[in-house]
């Protein structure tokens, strides 16, 4: 009967979230979780917009993009924001259907985005051909291939083994732990100034705060869900979507700001509708 009523048929994903299925529309399994996923995409698209500006009307942004091109980090940033945007699209497909094939469309971009963040944090420091060891230079050369292989192996594994969410959770968790650890090591080693005087630290702390609240929302819903809600009228998984999108946006801004200051550029925060982004300008020496 459910196959006849619901457009996508019976959900076959091993995970069902708190929001009740097909309550608002027979075409969308989890209505609020579906549309909140596009907030993640919106943050990715906004980040791409900031990197694509070629208008001289906004001189600060125009110069910022020019500096990014000179430092040869613009392509990395564009790819990071593109992968973040795809996470939102994949998540929307998944929550709209709760089909396993679309769950993979959600999980593959998550792995790709997290691995891209690891790549970014490991490549803030430029390779020093004179002083860096041969082992380090070899690692930097093969780093993209190592991370790509990791993502491919995990993708193949979760495609074959359907009923074991722990595989994705542990694999993705390892990338997130790596991001946290590497970011901590970088800030401890290179960012000695207090947080109020350090723009990279500000972005990193904004990222941590967003991700922390997002995780609390996710965990609370998983543990305390009752009849489709924890708090009546509030979908905490939708809050998770919005804040993880924001955290991803801020992490990339942390990377950009760190690169700019590493190369001697000054930075400032630009606030637009409550969202901060960086602008790089003149050399500080």
From Swiss-Prot:
Any Pfam family: Ceramidase
Chief place where the protein resides: membrane
Main enzyme class: hydrolase
Listed transmembrane segments: 34-54, 77-97, 104-124, 141-161, 166-186, 200-220, 236-256
Top-level taxonomic group: Eukaryota
Cellular compartment(s): Membrane
Gene Ontology CC terms, in alphabetical order: endoplasmic reticulum membrane
Bilayer topology term: Multi-pass membrane protein
EC number: 3.5.1.-
Record GO biological process: ceramide metabolic process
Keyword annotations: Glycoprotein, Hydrolase, Membrane, Transmembrane, Transmembrane helix
Glycosylation sites: 131
Molecular function terms, GO-annotated: N-acylsphingosine amidohydrolase activity
Family: Belongs to the alkaline ceramidase family.
UniProt-recorded name of the protein: Putative alkaline ceramidase dcd3B
């Amino acid at each position: 009967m459910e196959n006849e009523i619901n457009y996508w048929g019976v959900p076959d994903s091993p995970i069902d979230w708190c929001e009740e299925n097909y309550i608002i529309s027979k075409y969308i399994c989890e209505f609020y979780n579906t549309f909140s996923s596009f907030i993640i995409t919106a943050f990715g698209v906004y980040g791409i917009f900031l990197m694509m500006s070629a208008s001289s009307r906004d001189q600060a942004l125009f110069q910022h993009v020019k500096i990014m091109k000179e430092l040869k980090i613009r392509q990395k940033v564009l790819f990071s924001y593109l992968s973040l945007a795809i996470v939102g699209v994949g998540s929307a497909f998944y929550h709209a259907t709760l089909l396993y094939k679309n769950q993979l469309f959600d999980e593959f971009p998550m792995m790709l985005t997290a691995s891209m963040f690891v790549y970014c944090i490991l490549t803030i420091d430029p390779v020093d051909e004179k002083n860096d060891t041969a082992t380090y230079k070899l690692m930097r050369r093969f780093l993209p291939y190592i991370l790509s292989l990791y993502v491919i192996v995990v993708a193949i594994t979760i495609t074959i083994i359907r009923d074991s969410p722990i595989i994705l959770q542990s694999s993705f968790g390892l990338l997130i732990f790596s991001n946290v650890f590497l970011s901590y090591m970088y800030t401890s080693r290179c960012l000695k100034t207090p947080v109020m005087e350090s723009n990279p630290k500000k972005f990193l702390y904004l990222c941590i705060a967003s991700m922390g609240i997002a995780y609390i929302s996710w965990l609370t819903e998983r543990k305390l869900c009752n009849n489709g809600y924890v708090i009546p009228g509030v979908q905490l998984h939708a809050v998770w979507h919005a804040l993880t999108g924001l955290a991803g946006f801020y992490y990339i801004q942390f990377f950009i700001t760190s690169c700019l200051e590493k190369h001697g550029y000054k930075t400032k925060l630009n606030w637009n509708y409550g969202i901060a982004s960086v602008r790089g300008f003149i050399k500080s020496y």
